[in-house]
Amino acid sequence: MRHAGTQDIETPRLLLRRLLPEDAPQMYANWASDPEVTRYLRWEPHKSPAETRELLAAWALLYPNPDYYQWAMVEKATGQVFGSISLYNSLPGEPQQKTEWPGLDLTDGVWEPGYCIGRKWWNKGFTTEALRAVVAYWFT
């Protein structure tokens, strides 16, 4: 894998692009403030759009890094930012962990997807569509 960072990806129904601080109102309304949606995330539900904007501003600083992958999921038909999808390194180089799986090249760690979408978009195939596109991007 040649790390290229978060680049725009299009699918028939989605635009996957970088999250921006201006996305805070939609992110807050569509998923970041919902305890059911954020239940298994690494952060608690947001209490205000300002909290969401602060998180997005911090994430924006990471986009110049070529191994940072965090996309907004935008529904093309409506322009709504309704979720996010990312790739993250869950084993970023601990030498002792790399030897636990003999025969596997774990030089670059272990990369895993993460995703979160607003309830209104559940069970409509959006996450599957986004994940397929991200996996295709990852392996090209």
Language-model segment annotations:
Residues 1-120, 137:
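GNAT-family acyltransferases
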Residues 115-116, 122-140:
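Conserved acetyl-CoA-binding loop-helix of GNAT-fold acetyltransferases
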